[in-house]
């Protein structure tokens, strides 16, 4: 009897659990381990941030959903992966042996790389988790009483640019509904070499379409932007030219800011010898299998995918929902 353990209960971990359970016979066990007891639908976080959805509308309790399918669930953080011994060590010291491990943890949000950034002790917000979205909503309600400039965008080494654009237009729409948009200058600051690059070298006419829409919605932007630090009410940005030379230094004022951070691998995964690249992302082969450990597979944002192209300010390649689902299907069949 094989025991398959899945780390993570997000857009990768949950489909992995369901597909694995459906594919394997009842003689085999499937267990999901997650640091919290709920699933959050991350794509809805921008709506939570402006009050269009509540927390309760975008999360689900995991245990009953998995257990009725015969899938085990443990709501504890993993502190160590002992890949040689094929076991996990959980936050309470419990050891969980596995025959196969699927890593679908998502990323660690690397706010510490830019001094002064992040919602915990920093001066910027994020919509990468429902907790962060709720914090933006709480601060946004106070902001509406005395509005001012807003900055939205993505930090150097970010890879998930779509939600930054989405959030800019969501915030624009919400402010217009409130008849307050004219009181809120908006600046989009991104490490992309041009608007609509998206970490993909552009998608069709994304550059011209997004530039046009942003002009029509009175949004200014700074591209090739290397944000270096954030202070209360001020973002320090070095803008590079296409050759990587300094073009201009900006000090951008803001009253609220939502900047998507760079990602890294979570600590327990990044610490495993030979498993990951220097940023902690799992190195995999064409079968989604670890190059170092033949019984470890990985899917989602936590896998190592090279950038589509070299950019003056480093950018990463995004890993989207459908892409993650196909990774999961490959793991199950392999």
Predicted regions span which residues?
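FAD-binding core/adjacent interface of flavoenzyme oxidoreductases
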Residues: 1, 68-166, 170-179, 247, ...
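Beta1-alpha1 glycine-rich phosphate/pyrophosphate-binding loop at the start
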Residues: 2-72, 156-200
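Short amphipathic alpha-helical segments
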Residues: 17-20, 44-45, 113-116, 164-165, ...
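Short amphipathic alpha-helices and their capping/turn segments at secondary-structure boundaries
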Residues: 21-26, 90-95, 283-291
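A Rossmann-like FAD-binding core segment of flavoenzymes
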Residues: 27-31, 68-80, 96, 172-283
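FAD-site-proximal beta/loop scaffold in flavoenzymes
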Residues: 110, 119-146, 253-326
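Internal hydrophobic alpha-helix adjacent to the cofactor/substrate pocket in enzyme cavities
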Residues: 173, 321-334
């Amino acid at each position: 009897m094989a025991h398959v353990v899945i780390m993570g209960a997000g857009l990768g971990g949950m489909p992995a659990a369901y597909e694995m359970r459906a594919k394997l016979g009842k003689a085999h066990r499937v267990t999901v381990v997650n640091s919290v007891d709920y699933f959050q639908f991350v794509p809805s976080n921008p709506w939570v941030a402006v009050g269009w959805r509540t927390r309760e509308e975008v999360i689900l309790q995991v245990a009953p959903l998995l257990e009725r399918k015969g899938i085990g669930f443990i709501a504890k953080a993993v502190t160590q992966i002992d890949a040689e011994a094929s076991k996990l060590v959980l936050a309470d010291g419990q050891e969980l042996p596995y025959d196969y491990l699927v890593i679908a943890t998502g990323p660690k949000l690397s706010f510490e790389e830019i001094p002064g950034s992040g919602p915990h002790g920093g001066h910027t917000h994020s919509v990468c988790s429902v907790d962060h979205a709720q914090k933006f909503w709480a601060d946004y309600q106070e902001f509406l009483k005395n509005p001012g400039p807003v900055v939205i965008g993505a930090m150097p080494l970010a890879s998930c640019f779509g939600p930054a654009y989405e959030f800019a237009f969501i915030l624009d729409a919400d402010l217009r509904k409130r008849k307050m948009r004219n009181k809120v200058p908006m600046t989009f600051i991104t490490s992309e070499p041009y608007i609509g690059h998206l970490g993909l070298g552009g998608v069709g006419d994304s550059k011209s379409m997004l530039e046009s829409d942003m002009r029509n919605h009175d949004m200014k932007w700074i591209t090739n932007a290397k944000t270096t630090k954030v202070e209360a009410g001020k973002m320090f940005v070095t803008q590079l030219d296409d050759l990587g030379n300094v073009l201009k230094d900006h000090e951008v004022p803001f009253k609220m800011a939502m900047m998507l951070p760079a990602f890294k691998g979570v600590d327990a995964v990044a610490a495993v010898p030979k498993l990951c690249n220097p940023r902690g992302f799992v190195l995999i082969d064409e079968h989604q299998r670890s190059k170092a450990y033949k019984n470890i597979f990985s899917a989602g944002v936590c896998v190592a995918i090279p950038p589509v192209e070299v950019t003056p300010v480093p950018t990463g390649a995004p890993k989207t929902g459908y892409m993650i689902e196909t990774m999961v299907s490959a793991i199950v069949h392999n």
